[in-house]
Amino acid sequence: MSVFLCFLVLLPLILIFLNVLKPSKYKLPPGPKKLPIIGNLHQRRTLHPRNRRNLAEMYGPVALLQYGFVPVVAISSKEAAEEVLKINDLECCSRPEAAGMRATFYNFKDIGMAPFGDEWSLMRKLSVVELFSVKKLQSFKYIIEEENNLCVKKLSEFATRQSPVNLERAIFTLVGNIVCRIGYGINLYECDFFEADRVVDLVLKAEAVIRETVFSDFFPGRIGRFIDCISGQNRRLKNNFSVVDTFFQNVLNEHLKPGRESSTIVDLMIDMKKKQENDGDALKFTTDHLKGMISDIFVAGIGGVAGITLWGMTELIRNPRVMKKVQDEIRTTLGDKKERIKEEDLNQLHYFKLVVKETLRLHPTTPLLLPRQTMSHIKIQGYDVPAKTQILVNVYAMGRDPKLWENADEFNPDRFLDSSVDFKGKNYEFIPFGSGRRICPGMTMGTILVEMALLNLLYFFDWGLAKQEEAKEIINGEENFLAFFQVLHH
């Protein structure tokens, strides 16, 4: 009886596998050999963006992988990226479904992972107008300046004691409070349901949910769900997500309190939701839309900005020549007597901006851009890419391509001195924020947050390794940014 049940469970997989083995009528991209049924799924965790550079060297800039029964095309050249993100932008404008993403972004009721359609268009328009417009960015300046000034005061205490500082926690807390004040109108230092110093832990928990691999993402129907159930994947995902969801629900509850005086994008969506309920609009905001927006602001806004800031500091510690050059520019240009950095100060600095660009080249916020999914059959570099194929654009590999960049793995901001190449989505060799319809709507704000954090750190303090024995690790390592720094008053 048990053998018969096993046969019934495996029969659909066998039939699909036999179908996959049929000769294809398409000219598909080359790729590594696939195992029966699972395809290249066993290689998924080992294919770090750095390793995907080797994939491109072996199979070219357009490579085909098979994750279970999900075809995935990896893109790693600027020409192929332009075909995906510009020429075929509309055809590649949707997103694939994944359980971790579905949980984190409330059944894709957000901007980043929502499938292409009317809901996504409305949510994106709202974010651009109510959160990322020039007028809104100007109104947020005082928050950014206040929080950076507070961070400087706290770091000064470490400098006075000449004790090492956990800069990772300090930067995540700084960015977390800026993002929560701008996006939610909530000051974490005055919050009764969350401690500001726990931001880094919550961001890591949210990122763990997003990265969670479940079999139902790659195998159809009940089979994948059954494996997830018996393997404990579902339970682990739900446990991690419950912590994140509790925070998002508390944020929403704050906005639903009667008599609350605030005018954030969440408040606007609540007002629109009430209006749509009264007017009977066909396209309605739900609680999931509200929490999806809250999640977008938190996950994309905090982790990416804090990570880039820490990578910038790590690279400057690795490269003392660049550290001295950029600090000399900052302190010569701004003078020695500033008590507080203002956003206008950024416009006076040239080499400093190149340091930020070089950091983004080597350490993009998302090494593989958020996956796209083809909505119809297209061609990329002469290869057929059928509908419902996932597309991963490896901006990490393109940023380190020796054909595009001299001494590609070297941190050298001088490479941009006489270059017009920028990261705003038009130069496809350098697209850390993506390009086309799905370009990150928070690119401008995110860049300002990184620049303001770095400028304050470099103007007010001198930096070194917290422990001398870390020198070899920080110079040779590449996996992680440095968390602990020695900080001294300038």
Swiss-Prot record:
Catalytic reactions on record: 2-(L-cystein-S-yl)-2-(1H-indol-3-yl)-acetonitrile + 2 reduced [NADPH--hemoprotein reductase] + 2 O2 = camalexin + hydrogen cyanide + 2 oxidized [NADPH--hemoprotein reductase] + CO2 + 4 H2O + 2 H(+); 2-(L-cystein-S-yl)-2-(1H-indol-3-yl)-acetonitrile + reduced [NADPH--hemoprotein reductase] + O2 = (R)-dihydrocamalexate + hydrogen cyanide + oxidized [NADPH--hemoprotein reductase] + 2 H2O + 2 H(+); (R)-dihydrocamalexate + reduced [NADPH--hemoprotein reductase] + O2 = camalexin + oxidized [NADPH--hemoprotein reductase] + CO2 + 2 H2O
Entry's induction text: By salicylic acid, flagellin, oligogalacturonides, silver nitrate, UV-C and infection with A.alternata and various strains of P.syringae. Activated by the transcription factor WRKY33 upon infection with P.syringae.
Membrane-traversing stretches: 1-21
GO biological process: camalexin biosynthetic process; defense response; defense response to fungus; indole phytoalexin biosynthetic process; regulation of systemic acquired resistance; response to abscisic acid; response to bacterium; response to insect
Phenotype of the disrupted gene, per the record: No visible phenotype under normal growth conditions, but deficient in the phytoalexin camalexin accumulation upon bacterial infection and markedly increased susceptibility to infection by the necrotrophic fungus Alternaria brassicicola.
Membrane topology: Single-pass membrane protein
Gene3D superfamilies: Cytochrome P450
SUPFAM superfamilies (UniProt xref): Cytochrome P450
Chief subcellular location: membrane
Keywords: Membrane, NADP, Oxidoreductase, Plant defense, Transmembrane, Transmembrane helix
Name by which UniProt lists this protein: Bifunctional dihydrocamalexate synthase/camalexin synthase
Subcellular location: Membrane
EC number: 1.14.19.52
Record family assignment: Belongs to the cytochrome P450 family.
Summary of the function given for this chain in its UniProt record: Multifunctional enzyme involved in the biosynthesis of the indole-derived phytoalexin camalexin. Catalyzes two reactions, the formation of dihydrocamalexate from indole-3-acetonitrile-cysteine conjugate and the oxidative decarboxylation of dihydrocamalexate which is the final step in camalexin biosynthesis. Required for the resistance to the fungal pathogens A.brassicicola, B.cinerea, B.elliptica, B.tulipae, L.maculans and Colletotrichum higginsianum. Seems not to be required for resistance to P.syringae, P.porri, and not involved in age-related resistance.
UniProt-listed PANTHER family: BIFUNCTIONAL DIHYDROCAMALEXATE SYNTHASE_CAMALEXIN SYNTHASE-RELATED (PTHR47956:SF50), CYTOCHROME P450 71B11-RELATED (PTHR47956)
A GO CC term attached to the entry: endoplasmic reticulum
GO molecular function: dihydrocamalexic acid decarboxylase activity; heme binding; iron ion binding; monooxygenase activity; oxidoreductase activity, acting on paired donors, with incorporation or reduction of molecular oxygen
